[in-house]
Amino acid sequence: MSDFQREQRKNEHVEIAMAQSDAMHSDFDKMRFVHHSIPSINVNDIDLTSQTPDLTMTYPVYINAMTGGSEWTKNINEKLAVVARETGLAMAVGSTHAALRNPRMAETFTIARKMNPEGMIFSNVGADVPVEKALEAVELLEAQALQIHVNSPQELVMPEGNREFVTWLDNIASIVSRVSVPVIIKEVGFGMSKELMHDLQQIGVKYVDVSGKGGTNFVDIENERRANKDMDYLSSWGQSTVESLLETTAYQSEISVFASGGLRTPLDAIKSLALGAKATGMSRPFLNQVENNGIAHTVAYVESFIEHMKSIMTMLDAKNIDDLTQKQIVFSPEILSWIEQRNLNIHRG
């Protein structure tokens, strides 16, 4: 594939993603908090700091990976980096493969660091890149963490995608052992299982982003790029973010779990934190905001999102993220069936 074709593919991904709409129904709607009428705290008591062994985020919300590798996406990364700088959010760039292959593309990613020199930035590579390239990806952005995206359904629907996956787990193990910053194993919208969590724990992984279905749909994106558009029947493949977080429960004491995929509102973010996530990521909502409404409106959107999270936590009488994990939740029969059939051990306060 030529560099021009790769740039074109990057642009197609963003164009199709922006055209997708939020799911009408979400598993976040299948879980409810129990309301208690009189809080014992004030809004000003809320501490939204997200603390993991290696990363401290001012807020448990981050701009998740989407873009880079073309001139248009350079402009998007530039604007998102300004939003991150002005709001204190962490930010992940899209796959840096284009820059690792072609130095001419490096600026489409490094613009994020240029515009946000003191901020928290995650670099991003695929599970098949050599260790040396993973190290380069971290150095390229002076990144505080490295996402490794695992996207086998996307690759298999992508006309020119990868068809070989046997080496992925061993390669991830090599990268984790060599890279000095936290390595986050990131799904791309298909969710994670307890079996995968076991395998990742065995090779020393300490961070995952479960990225469940319900948000940006890469099966749909790649199917749109197929000549016959003949794999639309896989549109609903995978676990939701709620199901994925439940799948991780037994591993949350040893692996820091981030949640993304289909988060629509501050309440969805709070529900993710209550299920054990340490932070929540969104990509398309920020992408649409910054492209359609500009930087200032996107900053205001983020500030409002954070304030709404504080209001919800006050209603729940939760001073911090750890308190949220003790709050009572009522699940729908469908989610309870998932828990039972998957033999998940869910204990709450």
From Swiss-Prot:
Protein residues bound to Mg(2+): 155
Signal peptide: none
UniProt-annotated location(s): Cytoplasm
EC category name: isomerase
Any one GO biological process: isoprenoid biosynthetic process
The EC number(s) this enzyme carries: 5.3.3.2
Pfam families cross-referenced by the UniProt entry: FMN_dh (PF01070)
Keywords: Cytoplasm, Flavoprotein, FMN, Isomerase, Isoprene biosynthesis, Magnesium, Metal-binding, NADP
GO CC terms of this entry: cytoplasm
Cofactor (UniProt): FMN; NADPH; Mg(2+)
Catalytic reaction equation(s): isopentenyl diphosphate = dimethylallyl diphosphate
InterPro entries according to UniProt: Aldolase_TIM, FMN-dep_DH, IPdP_isomerase
Transmembrane segments: none
Positions of substrate binding: 9-10, 95-97, 154
GO molecular function: FMN binding; isopentenyl-diphosphate delta-isomerase activity; magnesium ion binding; NADPH binding; oxidoreductase activity
Residues annotated for FMN binding in this entry: 65-67, 95, 124, 186, 211, 216, 262-264, 283-284
Family from the record: Belongs to the IPP isomerase type 2 family.
Function of the molecule: Involved in the biosynthesis of isoprenoids. Catalyzes the 1,3-allylic rearrangement of the homoallylic substrate isopentenyl (IPP) to its allylic isomer, dimethylallyl diphosphate (DMAPP).
Subunit structure: Homooctamer. Dimer of tetramers.
Descriptive protein name: Isopentenyl-diphosphate delta-isomerase
Organism: Staphylococcus aureus
Gene symbol of the encoding locus: fni
